[in-house]
Amino acid sequence: MNTTISNQTPHIRIFDTTLRDGEQSPGCSMTPQQKLVMARALDALGVDIIETGFPASSHSDREAVAMMGRELRRPTLAVLSRCLQADIETSARALETVANPRLHVFLSTSPLHREHKLRMSREQVLESVHRHVTLARGYIDDVEFSAEDATRTEEDFLAEVTRVAVAAGATTINLPDTVGFTTPEEIRGMFSRLIASVEGADKVIFSAHCHNDLGLAVANSLAAIEGGARQVECTINGIGERAGNCALEEITMALKVRGAFYNIDSAINTPRIVSTSQLLQRLVGMPVQRNKAVVGGNAFAHESGIHQHGMLRHRGTYEIMRPEDVGWESSQMVLGRHSGRAAVERRLRALGYLLEEEEVKLMFEQFKALCEKQRLVTDADLQALMQDATVQEGYRLASMTISDVGSRANALVELSDPEGNRVAETAQGNGPVDALFGALASATGVKLELDSYQVHSVGIGADARGEASLSVRHDGVEYEGTGTSKDIIEASALAWLDVANRLLRQRERGVIAGKTAAVA
């Protein structure tokens, strides 16, 4: 294997550690089969290196790498090992069937870790690094060494550790910000100085592994790239211990969107980002927050009227990347109390409603009133408002009372007729809906034969509404109606009136389905 790699290459290697460091996030453990499913997605995404686990820690991790090794032939598959002979030997055995194996060994280097965790001197750390990197190279040509807690390590000692690891045969040097402590300026300088000063640095790849404890994982990783890093270790959705790791979707899109600035690319197939993110969410049961960059539900959603108006003119006014480039179908114009009339009118037009100026004004007033009752307004809500407006031209539901006692149900409905008069009727039926429809038929004089009837929920959470859909016949002609309300019985009444009022309007025009009107 040729390990002479130029750090001047314009390609950044994406080392995904979702299946190792990411899985260490509380509650995110995966079975070997789940890891294989995720690894397939990472392969399709174009990840260069997949860290599969920590074979010395469990049989499950050993089984997972074996399963991946039998199936995945393109990406490099890495496993993690402590600087212990037994760990390295176990890892080497786990990699025997892997087409492109990498053995990743690590040892803490900071004074805090040396004193309290390892109880080792500088000299002992250097000796261990040399011995175990050499041992690893005896098994695998591709060896990565990580100086754990590198960003809190004295820089002169970190340079010495790096020199020893390179001399022992490491092909990748990883400098982790293990506890998310550093800043972009600091990590940029650290990489730049080490790459410039360590003998043999031009023969290896330098790698960044940043945690997000201060919310700087992506920023620090980008700064490390500016300092000369040519591998970034990251996870899907940024999952990982404590506050997580550098998020793959964020760093790859930062490099793509700001390509002219960074002048470096990755092999990531970005239109697969969202589906990969959603797969991980399902596998580990950890959803991302709605405002999560790139993959959150609000990443390409716009509610503000000013922003929506700008988006309608030119999407570049408020979006720096296309949703399609990361796997979303399109941008979302979220309708809520901040939305303007132009966005509401556009959405109504998309739903098939062509309104006059006065009608748009009235609908927008009704829309604003609805926004005071719920956070978001869906397409179903807009359609319900349009139905309400339509119903106002005919019979409107004023009130209803339903009682279901014994084998028969009773319904009392009160309607406002087209002239504004009140009409009240009662009926009995084989259940609440049957009684309701009977009372409505008596009140309107419209007889409908019910073919099918169903209700389902529309909307989200507390804003959910019941939608009733029915198919009926009148004079042998089939009609369909829908109604939406917080109450499913009321929604059923509105669906029935939707059809009845349509028939009455057709009667006024003198024709129903090609026949002279006779609604009775």
Swiss-Prot record:
Associated pathway: Amino-acid biosynthesis; L-leucine biosynthesis; L-leucine from 3-methyl-2-oxobutanoate: step 1/4
Subcellular localization: Cytoplasm
Keyword list, A-Z: Amino-acid biosynthesis, Branched-chain amino acid biosynthesis, Cytoplasm, Leucine biosynthesis, Manganese, Metal-binding, Transferase
Subunit structure: Homodimer.
Entry-linked SUPFAM superfamilies: 2-isopropylmalate synthase LeuA, allosteric (dimerisation) domain, Aldolase
Record InterPro entries: 2-IPM_HCS-like, 2-isopropylmalate_synth_dimer, AIPM/Hcit_synth_CS, Aldolase_TIM, LeuA/HCS_post-cat, LeuA_allosteric_dom_sf, LeuA_bact_synth, PYR_CT
Cofactor(s) demanded: Mn(2+)
Region (Regulatory domain): 396-520
Protein name (record): 2-isopropylmalate synthase
E.C. no: 2.3.3.13
Main subcellular location of this protein, as a coarse class: cytoplasm
HAMAP family, sorted: LeuA_type1
Reactions the enzyme catalyzes: 3-methyl-2-oxobutanoate + acetyl-CoA + H2O = (2S)-2-isopropylmalate + CoA + H(+)
Function: Catalyzes the condensation of the acetyl group of acetyl-CoA with 3-methyl-2-oxobutanoate (2-ketoisovalerate) to form 3-carboxy-3-hydroxy-4-methylpentanoate (2-isopropylmalate).
Ribosomal protein found in the keyword field: no
Origin superkingdom: Bacteria
Biological processes per GO annotation: L-leucine biosynthetic process
Binding site for Mn(2+): D21, H209, H211, N245
Family: Belongs to the alpha-IPM synthase/homocitrate synthase family. LeuA type 1 subfamily.
